Amino acid sequence: MKQSLFLKKCSKFCYVLFAVCGCLACTQNHKIEWPQVTNETKPWTRWWWEGNAVRTTDLDTVMRKYQEANLGGLEITPIYGIHGYEDRFKDFLSPEWVDLFLYTLQEAKQLGLGIDLANASGWPFGGPWVTPEDACKTVAYKTYQLKEGEQLGEPVRYKEEGFVRLAGHTPVKLADLKEPVSANADLQTLALDQVRYKKELPLIIVTANSDKGECLDLTSKIKPDGTLDWTAPQGDWTICALFQGHHGKMVERAGPGGEGDVIDHFSASAIDHYLSKFDEAFKGKDISYLRYYFNDSYEVDDARGESNWTPAFFEEFQKYRGYDLRQHLPALLGIDTPDKNARVLYDYRQTINDLLINHYSIRWQHWAAKQGKGIRNQAHGSPANILDLYAVSDVPEIEGRDLVSIKAAPSVAHTEGKKLSSSESATWLNEHFQSNLGDVKKALDLFFLGGVNPVSYTHLTLPTIR
């Protein structure tokens, strides 16, 4: 019995020993290979072209240094210029600028550096070619109460008092600015952040809703002087008037030739007109080496008030939600029952979400795809489901220092089968000149923990060599 037990133990020992030796032999025969290093596996960097004060001699020098430092690629973002170098400024997308961009693509290809390009000089999308019709909008409103037999005793008008917000230190008075904003000289020095002109806003619609559930469209009863030619019939009536306003957000940090109004992100024609400027600038040019176009987040509402309207909103709302919002303006403005207010507001926000996805993100991605390129998009901050917006992007990109927020872009990349999810890296550290490489490593570690694979440092400037 004891001998049998001993033999069984020996047999088990020999079996385990044989298995271990076999595994060791397999391990010794298997050579572990490090994955191939490409420019996508290396860190990239945002590359400010300050004032587009770029020369080919500068490009030759610094791009070689970037390659020697093992950077994988450069994301070109033209921004505002440096005082004292105005004589070297070049307008974004001008023929001279395009020639320098083509030279950069050629040099990058020779050095094995990738190149991405921001689809704006600064952010968000916008510029001097954006007309007032294509610029971001806001909606203003007035409400009135009437009883049976009463008439409105004041004109239905809304006057925008106007204001100007500045990103720089040059004093600017609203009265000194021409309209549209693109008509003003030296926008680079003015550094405007938001401009709303003092003016009367155009009327969109006037409706009357009764306590019995009736709804009347009174827009045709408004006289040229704003008088409402209507007497309230039986019941208590709520009069709602909507007016279309100019939101006034300007492109942030814009470089020469990029200053101007931000686009209406909810309008398909606005993004089409905007991107046609790039088509025109690059027509007949070889930009095949360009990898992705880039957008540095939504940030339209980084301003006073929100961009919350587009001229075709009523029609789009009915298409997406299946009913006429014009009949429910009291609920939209939050003065109906709490339940109805909440339901209509939800539908309004969902429609904004749909327009931002379908009229902006998807159209932008399709435009890039027709060129054989993709888009990198920072969707955070958008008035929409950012996960859906990230899903449209070829490379979802995130920023920040909160791990849960960081995971948003990589999570979508994972579920949608996208191989890359990038980050705007090391932007938010300590105060200026108080950060060190240890702080940078800590920031990058957090991105890697959150699922980001390629990182894009923010940022490098282009040294202007005298």
Task: Annotate the PLM regions.
Residues 124-135, 298, 302-305, 376-402, ...:
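Substrate-binding cleft/loops of secretory-pathway carbohydrate-active enzymes
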Residues 369, 387-457:
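Catalytic-core region of carbohydrate-active enzymes that cleave or remodel glycosidic bonds
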Residues 116-122, 294, 357, 361-384:
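Aromatic-lined carbohydrate-recognition surfaces of secreted/lumenal glycan-active proteins
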Residues 30-35, 42, 54, 58-60, ...:
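Mature extracytoplasmic enzyme cores
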Residues 24-25:
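C-terminal motif of bacterial Sec signal peptides marking the signal peptidase cleavage site
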Residues 458-464:
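Conserved small/polar residues in nucleotide/adenosyl-binding loops
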Residues 43-54, 83-98, 254-273, 341-358, ...:
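The substrate-binding groove and active-site-proximal loops of carbohydrate-active enzymes
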Residues 47, 108, 293, 368, ...:
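Conserved, mostly hydrophobic/aromatic
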